């Protein structure tokens, strides 16, 4: 059974506002070295080269862009970029539950890639049930977006503490990569994501992810980044920017 998807005007407005944040950005490669500490030196493919996002516009330009988007949408201009977290630029996109938020943020991801070349995205959700629902939504819209974006291919990765090669692939692949994780997977020092791991030659999964400077999308933020510990955990992802 095929499902027909239609983009509604308010969804387009939300996508356009998010994309406008980076106006002036040009497509730039951002490669980094993934150190292989294994004696055999066989853990990493492609000579241990990681691929990430690189924002080149400065804070002043970004704030001008944000103010432009706010004025276009009848919102009072902000005087800073940081919202409830001072560690990285963060922006609120207000949409009610049931209005197609997952559809909107996937379309936003693809627009950010099309216009600016961004490749790495992390979606943080409050629970396993929501994580599975988000993954299902992302899967069933793949064909629709493939047609909308000239055959675009993107990789979906649900963080699994038992399959840490996913974190390595996320950091090293030169493709659009979308990781979906719960906040509980990385908000404590004892979490697998925050521990040195032999599967990754002694590296911590979160360090590989942070090297990519992902754009972070926080789903149901009232239940995700509502504590200081959660905010610190998200900051440890080293985001280029966040949408919530």
Where do the protein language model's features map onto the residues?
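RecA-like P-loop NTPase motor core of helicase/translocase proteins
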Residues: 1-244
